[in-house]
Amino acid sequence: MSSTTMGVRLDEETRNRLKEAAQKLDRTSHWLIKQAIFDYLEQIENDQVNLGHSTVAEQDIDESTEIPTAHYQPFLEFAEHIHPQSVLRSAITSAYRTPETQAVPMLLQQATLPENEAQATHKLAYSIAEKLRKQKNGVGRSGLVQGLLQEFSLSSQEGVALMCLAEALLRIPDKATRDALIRDKISHGNWRSHLGQSQSMFVNAATWGLLFTGKLVSTHNEEKLSNSLNRILTKSGEPLVRKGVDMAMRLMGEQFVTGETISQALANARKLEEKGFSYSYDMLGEAALTEKDAQDYLVSYQQAIHAIGKASNGRGIYEGPGISIKLSALHPRYSRSQYERVMSELYPRLLSLTLQAKQYDIGINIDAEEADRLEISLDLLERLCFEPELAGWNGIGFVIQAYQKRCPLVIDYVIDLARRSRRRLMIRLVKGAYWDSEVKRAQIDGLEDYPVYTRKVYTDVSYLACAKKLLASPNFIYPQFATHNAHTLSAIYHLAGQNYYPGQYEFQCLHGMGEPLYAQVVGKIADGKLGRPCRIYAPVGTHETLLAYLVRRLLENGANTSFVNRIADTTISLDELVADPVKEVNRMAQAEGQVGLSHPKIPLPHKLYGDERKNSPGIDMSNEHRLASLSSALLTSATENIHCEPLLGDTFSSSEKTQEPQSVLNPANHADIVGTVREATEAEADFALTIAQEKGEIWFATPPAQRASFLIRAAELMEQQMGPLMGILVREAGKTYSNAIAEVREAIDFLYYYAAQVAQDFDNNTHRPLGPVVCISPWNFPLAIFSGQIAAALAAGNTVLAKPAEQTPLIASKAVAL
């Protein structure tokens, strides 16, 4: 999407009013102007403004006046790319990382069913689960894979070992490294404990094989066998396991993948289509890493739409097959930081695929991905909905994840979007498949909270609350409920009412996981079915493209909280299996004394290190509110006249300062003078060494706990100055914004870490200082390593002579000042 810079001349009074108003909101003047324009345009488009009564005197606006070319202003371009938001979009952003204690109580109110409806839901869910459990004891490929997953669950060491193998083997190109991994993961498993535990001959055979090969690959540690025999068995063992795991992966792959090609998948789907099921096909593959990847995925989608469209044969978007697409497959830089490229390069590809789908009248769903891509995907969706060529067509679909705290507000937004664009959107509601990575990423980035719920039962409650919202807007939303949970299915069945009509809503399930459950749903009521439609999400791809999708499915199946896993576990009663999540949350709240407490074993990101030390806070670069605040801080920091010189105290004679100040330039733009620096003379260096020696005893005598408190205070000051410190790093060191955040966080981490090292059990009598320590900073980590060296030396009781890299003196000076 191209952009144009437009301007208007303002008097000083108006400029000051803008600045003061923006500061009240912790925003920039540029953001406020764009937001005002956005809001006013929205009012005009909704016929809410009388243009005959302008509040601005027209004679004050001279549209013919050219805006003079301004001098370079640091971070102005960053500020210009902060997007104004509507009320609904702003609400979505605000809910990004809402504490669970705030989010869950609201969900409970929305998800609670009337008592008679709750009883009917439980009764139906119990009946479905009872029949399903009996079926799970049967045979067939589905039962074989289910048995293997059940026996080697992710709660066992052996299950984790298999998971590691499944996740890693296809990433390793050479056999030697693959064998080394097998040796590590298989040889330590207690496979004997699983022998004979399953009723499945297949599972027991697999266990025998793993037991045998586990011994083979560990024989180099078995003293009772000769070295020669060890070598023979080891050489034969690892390739044997590699082949065995490869076969197991292929078996599971056939369980979860409809076909290696779209034509094969369409042929394989006919059997269940004849029973009333429909399909949504997904071309397997993960995010594009190169432009060639993106073009290959685009061609794959085009060919699939053509084949699916021909197979649909005019059945339409609700009755016929459809396709699901991943936006990350269409562009290698699909992220908020590359917004303009996404809009100018990815969007045309999305539009072309959607127009092709419209030509065949098949539904096209935009798949959900990681949380940081949600809001940019909403921008793409909105633009798509207002395309004139797609007007009046209801085949556009979007996937929303119930485990995200923003989910209810996203639903409010898409309902409004459908209303404004005068169409009916297909909305697939899923629980979410990236939970592990979302939690880990928030911890790594030091964000204030998680974008997802930490307890699965909260996600179940969210799903019900969001399902109610979708069903309440039948004119604008075609709900697609993707679930394998009998209670969730039953609740939706009752929420939607008994007067079902074609096109009201549909259920969805994953190929290889949900067919036994939905065999009770799809079909005529006279045949004992529920008479509701189900669409199967059907992955298409080769064995090599299966890996990441298979891992997500294994995580879903192998998790102890998964309905698919628990249905086969006869130690879990059916009543427990189909328990109402709302009642379960209420029971937990009674026991814990508060509604919505997070998982006790998942600390918030800032508490990642427990009581030992605090995790350094980061900035979420996909959060428009955080970006606006950062923009304001960066623009303010750029107005500071930064000057640095040797810091020697007041005792050094100023007459000896002979060096002239030099300008420090932005390496990316020499028109940007970041500040000035006066370098130290030889006399100043000698004086600094003398002072460091003289003050050494005083600093060493300071109690370690007090030294630690000074470092913690410095860390807290750095946290408060994140924006200004980032600004200097970007301008002086040429850092990108994300690298600058990481740099400041690493410096803060060093301070907290070394403070924690000496805060307790550090004795000055046993840990003597070295004396004055010289810390020389590298230019590529001018704050982090600079601060880390100093923090370690100071914590241990040494005085420090700190010398920054000659390219980056300003950031070092700022750090020392703090």
Located regions from the model:
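Terminal low-complexity tails and localization/encapsulation signals of metabolic enzymes
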Residues: G528-K529, G541, T545-A548, R552-T690, ...
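Short Lys/Arg-rich basic patches
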Residues: M1-L10, K19
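Surface-exposed, Lys/Arg-rich phosphate-binding patches that contact polyanionic backbones
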Residues: E12-W31, Q35
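Short, basic amphipathic alpha-helical segments that act as recognition/interaction helices
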Residues: S29-V49
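Long, K/E/R/D-enriched contiguous segments that form extended
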Residues: L289, K358-Y360, A371-C385, G392-F398, ...
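Positively charged, amphipathic and often flexible ligand-engagement surfaces
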Residues: D60-P617
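Short, positively charged interaction helices/loops
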Residues: Q43-D60, T65
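Rossmann-like NAD(P) dinucleotide-binding subdomain of oxidoreductase/dehydrogenase enzymes
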Residues: V730, A756-L818
